Amino acid sequence: MKILPLDPSDQAVVAIPARIGSTRLPRKVLLEINGKPMLHHVIERSQKAELVTKVFVITDNEEVFESVGPTGAKALMSDPECSSGTARIASVIDQLPGGIIINVQADQPVVEPKLIDGIIQKLVNTEADISTPIWQIQTTEQLSDASVVKVVCGHQG
């Protein structure tokens, strides 16, 4: 992928909403994978994206907040009443620098840095206000699985 330079006003940051209260897998963002919390893997992969200037973790939990310290990311506290990760990011939007904010979920320990860069490039090079990576559903099980997010696209994607 060809990386184009960003205008300073287009600074891109990754915002990782992280909550501890998962119902299907409690405390999942702090569960260890290869000796470190899942959240740390997400942070490290996000930091490897060439166009990302800073990574933020937004949480309402003190333990998650404290765990961010050694990673080089910055932790921000959000309102515990936020109903979604997007709402969590919106609650601290004034504390996030830059013109581009990429929402990376805290349970994506193998997120590809090139995917993050591709989203940033798409936002810089088009008039799009938002970009969401999607994948085609591969099985009928995925189609009926409530935990698999579905997206309906128009003719232009």
Question: Model regions: which residues?
Answer:
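Conserved core of the sugar-phosphate nucleotidyltransferase
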Residues: 112-157
